[in-house]
Structure formats: structure tokens, C-alpha cells
Amino acid sequence: MSERSARRRNRESARRNDDREIMVLLTSKIMERTAVFVTVGGLVTTLVTTFIPLWKTLNSDLNEVENWYSGLWHTCVFTEEVGIQCKAFESLMGLPVDLLVSRILMLVSVGTGALAVVVAFPGLQGVDLGSGTRPRMKRGLLIVSGVLSWVSGLTSLAAVSLVAYVTVVEFWDENLPDVVPRWEYGEAMFSGWFSGLFLVIGGSLFFVAVCMADYDVEQTVARLPNTPQEKPRRQHYLKTEVL
């Protein structure tokens, strides 16, 4: 029995050491920094995706010299002789509905993503602004930042998916002759999907950091000696107990 109990104790101590090593590597502070890094990466990618004219590409077998590119704000044509020439859309009235809605969604994505980074900065551990920030307030700021990152990522995914859906529908339109060239996916489509995923992952990491911080607080409170000391019994109470 003594050998078995010793083995159990060794196993439990080894597990505790492994858990401690994992907690050292994965702390709430590191998770917060990782969330900010991923969110900033998604925000920068979303900002670039919003303004580059590479959402859709068009090239035909009849005219291989010209390559057309279309974005949310410009339409560009590339030729070997002249190079690339871009022209902005003249009016909102003549703009397709999918591009107009995608413009709004991408601007909302950029705005909420930037706000998420700004809100998360004072909520990070080790960042003290002014007279100090309470832990409960920091926790609330990180939660708000996570929600904003989620909104930013979902709006970016919705905008890119909308343009992708319309492009697929127009590509397989049976009413158009086979000779007519069709728009295809551009590089900005894929960068928009990746940026949306980064923002969603960044928001999720903010929630994970909050949960890890709450767990650390619970473990700290549980380790505190809060066992009340027994009051000394009176002499007459001891006598009645003996009787």
C-alpha cells in the first residue's frame, strides 16, 4: 500500500508540475498581447483589402493584351504598353447594389476594428493610464474589445462573401453567351476572408484572456488561508461535555 500511495503522489506531483509549466507559458497577459497582435493584423489586412482594386479580375481570350481589375472604389485596366490606369466610379446611383453594401460593411469593419484596438489598449495588464484602472474596468474593456473584433470580422466576411456570391451567379449566368468574358475572383477576395477570420480569432482570444484572468483570481482566492479559528470553549461547557 505504501508503494502505491507513493506512486500516486509522484504522479500527482508530476501533473501539477506540468500544469504549472503550461500556465507559465500561457498566462492571461500573454494571451492579451496575442489577441491585440492578431486583431491589429486583421485590421491592417482589412484596411488594405477595402481600397485595393483587386476584388474581381477579367481577361478574355479575344483580347489577351488587356486585363481588367475591379474593386469597391475603382476600376482599372492593365496593358503592356501603357501600364495600369484606374478610374473611380462616377456616382453612387450607378453603382451595383452588392458593391454599395460591401462598401458600407467594409467601412464598418475598419471602424469597429480600430475601435477594438483602442479600447483594448487601456485594458491590458501592465498598462496604467492616469490614476490607474481597476481590474473590473480592465475586464470590461477587454470584453468590449472582443465584441468589437467579432463585429469587425463578421462584417468583413459578409462583405467579401456578398461580392463572391454575386460574382459566381453572374459567372454561371446562362443568358450570357459563352464568348462574353466574365468576372472572376481577385486576390482581395481571399485577403478579405483571411482578415475577417483574423479579427474573429482576435476577439475570441480576448474572451479567452478574460476567462484565464478570472481563473487566476479564483485560484489566488482559494489559496488564501480563510479557515476561521475555533473559539476557546468555556470551562462550564467543557464540564457539561465531560458529564
What are these regions (language model features)?
Residues 1-43, 48-64, 70, 128-138, ...:
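Intrinsically disordered terminal tails
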Residues 35-47, 103-120, 139-167, 188-203:
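Alpha-helical transmembrane segments of multi-pass membrane proteins
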Residues 52-103:
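A surface-exposed beta-alpha-beta supersecondary segment
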